[in-house]
C-alpha cells in the first residue's frame, strides 16, 4: 500500500517529486539546481556534469512521469520518465524513456544514476 503525501507539505517528499524538480530545473537551464537533486557530492564530478550540460546545450522541452516504484525497505526507488530534449546536435526534440534510480539520503530522495 502506498501513502500519498501532499506535495505542498514537503519538498521532494516522493521520488517523483524529486524527478519533477530535477527536470523543471533542467527546463529552466538551472543546471546547478538540477544537480542538487542528485547524490553527486564530489565537486570535481559536479563541475564535469555542469560542463557537459553547457557544452552540449541540453534543453528539456517536455517530460512526463510514467511510474514510480519504491523498494520494500523505503530506501531505493525507480521512477520511469519520458522526456523530449534538444541539444547542440539537433534542434529537433528527441524523445526518450528512462528509468531513473533514486536513493534516500538524509531523508531526501536523490537521483543516483
Residue ranges and their predicted role:
Residues 12:
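Short, conserved catalytic or interaction motifs in soluble domains
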Residues 6-9:
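C-terminal motif of bacterial Sec signal peptides marking the signal peptidase cleavage site
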Residues 17, 26-78:
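Short solvent-exposed beta->alpha transition segments
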Residues 70-113:
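Exposed beta-sheet edge and beta->alpha loop/turn motif
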Amino acid at each position: 500500500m502506498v501513502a500519498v503525501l501532499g506535495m505542498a507539505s514537503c519538498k521532494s517528499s516522493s521520488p517523483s517529486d524529486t524527478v519533477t524538480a530535477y527536470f523543471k530545473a533542467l527546463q529552466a537551464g538551472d543546471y546547478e539546481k538540477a544537480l542538487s537533486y542528485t547524490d553527486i557530492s564530489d565537486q570535481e564530478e559536479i563541475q564535469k556534469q555542469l560542463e557537459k550540460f553547457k557544452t552540449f546545450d541540453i534543453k528539456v522541452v517536455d517530460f512526463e512521469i510514467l511510474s514510480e516504484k519504491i523498494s520494500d525497505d523505503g530506501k531505493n526507488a525507480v521512477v520511469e520518465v519520458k522526456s523530449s530534449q534538444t541539444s547542440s546536435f539537433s534542434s529537433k526534440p528527441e524523445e526518450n524513456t528512462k528509468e531513473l534510480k533514486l536513493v534516500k539520503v538524509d531523508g531526501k530522495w536523490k537521483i543516483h544514476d
